[in-house]
């Protein structure tokens, strides 16, 4: 095994504490652990506020990029949607930096793995649109996580619905199954797919659950479920991070 490990950037979310007196940029430990243990990478958190002129220099240091989930949805002005209600959480800084990083990564060949909000950002970055509230669409399931003071972490991340993989697509090369069960913790989802993207999986109610960017030379995959949850127990999630890690290592060798 090579002693060189890929440096993998992980997007962060803006968190406000102490009544607005303290703002931090953070990400869940599960993403960090999955990158370190299953992608065999060195995880580096990327704060939301980086100057445009510094993005290219940042990418010279990265061998991969993970786009994490987040409480805030992508603001609709980025895809021509109706404004959010005033109480909807937003993350202006993350929208700005991630939507610029995605096409830059594709152009350079930096591997990208988008999770939950990440798949939505990949779609918006290339001109696609999003549903604001999937559960309000006729014949669609409620994809949001269960809520309540007594809801456990296990219940939040339980396998909720089936997804079907696109025939002869990315997942046919990754695992030996045509379908799989996944967790579901999102209210927003892909509406119109960007022209540059390819659908890799649907949920059983027709919601797009996985995509790829075919023009990327190695790995540019987004999934709507939370693949960072217990990859040590879930073969699909484990395989995704391992394949992403291989692509990141290959990127080092091609620099």
Describe the role of every protein-language-model region.
Residues 1-113, 124-131, 135-174, 181, ...:
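N-terminal beta1-alpha1 cap of cysteine-dependent amidohydrolase-like domains
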Residues 116:
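Conserved G/P- and acidic residue-centered "switch" motifs that form tight phosphate/ATP-binding loops
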Residues 119:
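The feature captures the ABC ATPase H-loop/switch
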Residues 221-224:
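Active-site-proximal beta-strand elements of phosphoester/diester hydrolases
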